[in-house]
Amino acid sequence: MPTTQQSPQDEQEKLLDEAIQAVKVQSFQMKRCLDKNKLMDALKHASNMLGELRTSMLSPKSYYELYMAISDELHYLEVYLTDEFAKGRKVADLYELVQYAGNIIPRLYLLITVGVVYVKSFPQSRKDILKDLVEMCRGVQHPLRGLFLRNYLLQCTRNILPDEGEPTDEETTGDISDSMDFVLLNFAEMNKLWVRMQHQGHSRDREKRERERQELRILVGTNLVRLSQLEGVNVERYKQIVLTGILEQVVNCRDALAQEYLMECIIQVFPDEFHLQTLNPFLRACAELHQNVNVKNIIIALIDRLALFAHREDGPGIPADIKLFDIFSQQVATVIQSRQDMPSEDVVSLQVSLINLAMKCYPDRVDYVDKVLETTVEIFNKLNLEHIATSSAVSKELTRLLKIPVDTYNNILTVLKLKHFHPLFEYFDYESRKSMSCYVLSNVLDYNTEIVSQDQVDSIMNLVSTLIQDQPDQPVEDPDPEDFADEQSLVGRFIHLLRSEDPDQQYLILNTARKHFGAGGNQRIRFTLPPLVFAAYQLAFRYKENSKVDDKWEKKCQKIFSFAHQTISALIKAELAELPLRLFLQGALAAGEIGFENHETVAYEFMSQAFSLYEDEISDSKAQLAAITLIIGTFERMKCFSEENHEPLRTQCALAASKLLKKPDQGRAVSTCAHLFWSGRNTDKNGEELHGGKRVMECLKKALKIANQCMDPSLQVQLFIEILNRYIYFYEKENDAVTIQVLNQLIQKIREDLPNLESSEETEQINKHFHNTLEHLRLRRESPESEGPIYEGLIL
């Protein structure tokens, strides 16, 4: 029967299991011999156990498990030997003896174990033995076996390396220099073994070998950790000996994986103070690394670490004599120059880190931030980059770069000091420019940054011009209406931040803003011009407040209303009618309230313009009713007109109301007009209400007549009730023309018509309205002590 082939994983498990079983058997025998003080037999079993490490069949992961199991057993031997030597057994003999072990792997592991015990028992032999051991390990040149052997050497000697502050005879016991040499040599040899791993085996297994190398990297990196733990390694020794030795090995090995890992290792394991003193050599080495090394990540890791160090509240900060930004700026430029094939997004990533460094370490140096932006512009020019696509990696990095100053300063005026911010902004394509413009304006709004001069307005408008005017590179199809409205609303809100303490300066600001917004096209100006008009009206009120200190305030107000008129006219040209109508009405109100020279003429002109728009541009019946109601309501509030101007305007309102297309609309509008003849005011009566009772009655009678002409019974009754409420209003305002008899007749008419209506939800609402009206009259009739006329003779 054929045997099924095992998977590589199953095979590994089987091989490892067999090796572990052999280790257990040999370690049991070793311990048994040690318990009986049979040292030579114990060493023989230890050698057999260590023989398992000679295998080439195990993967690094499996080999590591085997190595750990054997290391634990060797610890038992080490403890035993330490006790024996303490009792007086000769170590030197044993050290000589284990060198005769048959195979090199068991021999060297035993030598290290005995050697460490020897040093602990006789410290004066330390220098020679350490040198001896690190040299002897060269005997194993198989990458995997050699790496683990040297790792064992490093682990065992951890606590016996000479360091600062030890009272010793340096001639024989060694000093900190010997420790540095020992670890550096071990590191160099381990790195060579690690690099050599890639050349073993078949080329088709390259990816697998790379994965295995990744798994083993920590063994090499441990050497650097050990160096960083030596107290005797101060800044000077680090600069002169340690870093020089490490970088020499890193650069010379010409292996991308090793170089990238070890450079990152250096950054992580050594203190910030050391990095600050060795920036130039470290960054120079970065420029010499293999082309496949992602240098960007290495430099960014160092920059980010030092930026954090500088930002730490409890830290000493960056020493004044170290020009951190300048060093990084120059060295990063060198690295970019040395790597012509570096991806554009990586180049920008480096600039992102530089700008972060400038912001955190030198928050007051706007020039440093601008220097980074300038460098980026120069790089883009060299690369001939134009209109970077939104979806590209470069665009994402450039967005990060430009958002940093916006988010850090939270003040657009500081951002505008960066001369190269706008030129860099222009490298984006349409979508990215639009999105960044929204981001900038949102920041201005979030932090309520006031824009106080014409130049600032110009600069910001030019920066976010994608939101304000059509662009040559914008898509042909129309934008999504909701998104467009959101973007333009941002711009509209931004207008309210154009505020100068000086009213004259404010006028210039509004003029500048209008130049930009005026070129925005019909779709945009409906969002952007109305806030500008309101800002103009507010400015006119400010001039009124300053009238005592500014003798030209009236002329300035006329100028402002002329500005508003022109701005509203632009909206009319864009074929918008309701919006400019409302703005004209608002302007008429403002002119009337402010009361400057010629204000009546201005207010009349604005009212006339509103009427013209109503008559010429608004055709929808619903919109017409809303518009005439607005005109009547606005006019009723105004008291700046003489009778000469007031009379034609109120007559015009009544005429327009009676010409509405639908009868119900006519009825409602005409009854609303009644208020103009009662509470309307003009200058001939010193601002007192007209109280033209007769004209009020004419309007209400006309409204009733129109209601009678309605074909829909329920609509007719509804109008009667609404007109009844108007009659009641004027009766309570003591209009003599409205009598109890008139009220009784109308109530009687409604009572007769109501039962004839078909049962429906609408009828229910009409009944409720009528009931509430009668309830009001009942309460007034039963409370004669309340103010207002008495309802005597009212039939309910």
From Swiss-Prot:
Q: How does it sit in the membrane?
A: Peripheral membrane protein
Q: Which residues carry this modification: Phosphoserine?
A: 7, 783
Q: Where in the cell is it found?
A: Cytoplasm; Membrane; Endosome; Early endosome
Q: What is the effect of changing residue 524 to W?
A: Found in a patient with Parkinson disease
Query: Region Interaction with SNX3: start and end of each range?
Result: 25-44, 205-215
Point out residues bearing the modification Phosphotyrosine: 791
The record's PANTHER family line, in alphabetical order, gives: VACUOLAR PROTEIN SORTING-ASSOCIATED PROTEIN 35, VACUOLAR SORTING PROTEIN 35
Q: Which disease is it linked to?
A: Parkinson disease 17: An autosomal dominant, adult-onset form of Parkinson disease. Parkinson disease is a complex neurodegenerative disorder characterized by bradykinesia, resting tremor, muscular rigidity and postural instability, as well as by a clinically significant response to treatment with levodopa. The pathology involves the loss of dopaminergic neurons in the substantia nigra and the presence of Lewy bodies (intraneuronal accumulations of aggregated proteins), in surviving neurons in various areas of the brain.
The name this protein goes by in its record: Vacuolar protein sorting-associated protein 35
Please give the organism: Homo sapiens (Human)
